[in-house]
Every structure is written in structure tokens, then in C-alpha cells.
A protein has these predicted regions:
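A residue-level marker of the well-folded mature domains of exported/periplasmic proteins
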Residues: 4, 23-315
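Bacterial N-terminal signal peptides that target proteins for export
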Residues: 1-10
Length: 315
């Protein structure tokens, strides 16, 4: 009996290195986001990492903060660390192409999330929100809030990010249908709350009679709300956002923001990792196309209670 027990223990001990080797064999997935100080990008990284780990990979998250040189260095690190895949939120539609090419030259597949690059056929997949659709539903909701006449201003995101122009153009397509709505100012605030606050202060000084602010993302919108509060104007000016961040949802619930457009970042961040896993194992992502659009949803005071977690809206 003792000999039998010893043999079982020896067999079990012998299999441990094999089990450890098998677990390690899945490899490292490197995740590169823009800036986790923004809850949107924080969620992007957290969801991608958790999904990778649930599939048996190790994963790390780093941030380039919109700087292509930093991004390039992080790609170098991913190559040095022998990553089996890279999940990248690109810093620049044109400027990130070289970094993606560098990873591909090292035989590491790249999966882009949230933003596109201006070259097809490099990344294995580009998974992004349907920004045009999101902008359209947001702009229509904004018109319902402010009415069909009056002066308004726009806060624009990072010009190096195609999403900024796509959303702005989507707003324009809807709002130009209302001839008595006049855009009297537009400022670049680079997706940033502090810049949104500062630009809103300047816009208010130049255009004190505005009735609305339409923003390319929630952080800029929240900055605008802070400036409007400070000026005692929030009750007169309606603000709309885009992202579906927890702070924006709280502002909608408080009646300070009219709506936010929810980007399904939690969905496509997880999906990018799943497609990376499938590609690693089969040589195919399983998707019908490289560029994949994920529809956005509107969050208003009528459905805000269905917000069940960061960037998650129950049906």
C-alpha cells in the first residue's frame, strides 16, 4: 500500500512540470492602450487582460498616451518579450502604421481595437465602435433635448484619431438638417477633461448665448459641464457626450448631461483577444472581414438604470 501510494505521488510529481509547461505554452499577449487615466481606456485594457488570462495566456497592459515614439518602444518590448499577439489601440491613424509593420516583421499578429489605421491588410483585425451610427443617434437625441434652433458649439477629439472626424461628420450630417441650429464655435480638446473645461471657458466668453454643447467624448463633455457650472450656465446649456463612461452615466442620472452614446468597448476588447486566440490556434480569426464595426447604444435618463457596469448596458 505504501509503495502504491509512493508510485502515485511520483507519477503526480512527474506530471507537474508537464502541466506547468502546457500552461506556459499559451504565451504572452501584449496589450497597448492609450491612457488608463481615462476610464474608457482603463476598461479596454482590463477587459482584454482578463479575457487573455481566462484563455490561458499571460498578459500585460501598457499605455502610449497618444505618443507614437512611446508606442514604437512598446512594440519593441512586445517583440523582445516574444509576445504571441499584440492588442493595440493605435496612437495615430498614419503614425502607427510603422509600429504595426514592425510587429508583423517579427511574426507577431496585431489586433487593433477602438481606432483604425489608414492601411488595410496589416492588422489581422480592426475592431471599432460604429462611430458614424453612434454620432447619428447622439445628435438626434441632442436635438430632442435642445430643440431645433439656437447657437451651439462642438468639442472635437484628437485630430490624429480618425474617430474624432467620424463623430464630428456624423453630428454634422444630422444637425445640418436643422437650418435654425447654428454652430458658432468648435475647439479641439483632445479627448481630455481638463482641456474640455478650458476650451469651454473660452467658448463661453466668445459665445455667451449658446444653448448646447455637443462633444466627441465624455471626458471633454464633463470638462464642459464643470465650466458651465462655474459660470452658472448649466441650466441654460444642454450637453451631450460619447463613450458611456461611469462618470458620464452619473451625470446623466443627475440631469447634468442629456445623454451619452455607449461605445461597446468591453465587447470588442474581449472579442479582439478571442480572435487573437483563434488565429494563434488555427491561422484564422474566424471573422468575415478585417474591419469590424460594433454598434453603439444611447443612454438617457429613461434607461440609465440599465447600466450594470463600466460600459455595459443590459437589454
Amino acid at each position: 500500500m505504501i509503495d502504491k501510494a509512493r508510485r502515485i505521488l511520483l507519477v503526480a510529481a512527474a506530471t507537474l512540470p508537464l502541466m506547468a509547461s502546457h500552461a506556459w505554452a499559451a504565451g504572452l499577449i501584449s496589450i497597448i492602450v492609450t491612457d488608463p487615466a481615462n476610464p474608457y481606456w482603463l476598461t479596454e485594457g482590463q477587459v482584454a487582460k482578463a479575457t487573455a488570462e481566462s484563455l490561458g495566456y499571460t498578459a500585460n497592459v501598457s499605455a502610449h498616451k497618444g505618443d507614437t515614439n512611446t508606442e514604437s518602444t512598446m512594440i519593441d518590448t512586445a517583440i523582445t518579450n516574444k509576445s504571441v499577439a499584440i492588442i493595440l489601440d493605435p496612437a495615430n491613424a498614419d503614425g502607427s502604421i510603422g509600429a504595426v509593420k514592425k510587429a508583423i516583421a517579427a511574426n507577431i499578429p496585431v489586433f487593433l481595437v477602438n481606432a483604425e489605421i489608414n492601411q488595410d491588410g496589416l492588422a489581422k483585425a480592426q475592431l471599432v465602435s460604429n462611430n458614424a451610427q453612434g454620432a447619428a443617434i447622439g445628435a438626434q437625441q441632442w436635438v430632442e433635448a435642445i430643440g431645433d434652433k439656437g447657437n451651439y458649439v462642438e468639442l472635437f477629439g484628437n485630430p490624429a484619431d480618425n474617430n474624432a472626424a467620424t463623430r464630428s461628420n456624423g453630428y454634422e450630417t444630422v444637425l445640418t438638417q436643422y437650418s435654425d441650429l447654428k454652430k458658432v464655435g468648435k475647439e479641439v480638446a483632445n479627448w481630455d477633461r481638463t482641456q474640455g473645461y478650458q476650451k469651454m471657458q473660452s467658448l463661453l466668453q466668445a459665445h455667451p448665448d449658446i444653448v448646447g454643447v455637443i462633444s466627441g467624448n465624455d471626458e471633454m463633455a464633463l470638462g464642459a459641464i464643470a465650466a458651465l457650472k462655474e459660470a452658472g450656465k448649466l441650466s441654460q446649456v444642454k450637453v451631450g457626450g460619447f463613450d458611456g463612461s461611469p462618470d458620464a452615466v452619473a451625470a446623466v442620472k443627475a440631469g447634468e448631461m442629456q445623454y451619452t452614446v455607449l461605445q461597446p468597448v468591453a465587447v470588442f476588447s474581449a472579442e479582439a483577444v478571442k480572435q487573437a486566440d483563434k488565429f494563434i490556434k488555427t491561422g484564422s480569426t474566424g471573422a468575415a472581414s478585417e474591419k469590424q464595426l460594433f454598434d453603439c447604444a444611447l443612454i438617457t435618463k429613461d434607461n440609465v438604470d440599465k447600466y450594470t457596469g463600466p460600459f455595459t448596458l443590459s437589454q
